[in-house]
């Protein structure tokens, strides 16, 4: 059973998406925590020193999808 799941989808420019990914990378490298805000509530998740990284690329006829997943 999930304690909490946050999913957010939004349309961004390529540059805006890169900036958002960069912000996550900076949080991981500097603080060892990820911070999320949802409904006025701030959630902080500690990330250990070692994680598993999964990168998946799907090419379909009418759509492309890149998934980046960290698990620990």
What function would you assign to each model-found segment?
Residues 17-20, 38, 64:
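Functionally constrained cores in energy, signaling, and assembly domains
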Residues 1-19, 24-26:
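Terminal, regulation- and interaction-focused segments at domain boundaries
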Residues 8, 32-54:
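Short, structured protein-protein interaction patches enriched in aromatics and acidic/basic residues
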Residues 51-72:
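C-terminal edge-of-domain segments
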């Amino acid at each position: 059973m999930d304690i909490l799941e946050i999913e957010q989808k939004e349309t961004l420019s390529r540059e805006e998406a890169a900036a958002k990914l960069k912000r996550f990378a900076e949080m991981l490298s500097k603080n060892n925590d990820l911070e999320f805000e949802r409904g006025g509530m701030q959630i902080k998740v500690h990330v250990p020193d070692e994680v598993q990284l999964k990168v998946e690329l799907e090419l379909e006829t009418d759509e492309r999808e890149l998934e980046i997943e960290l698990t620990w």
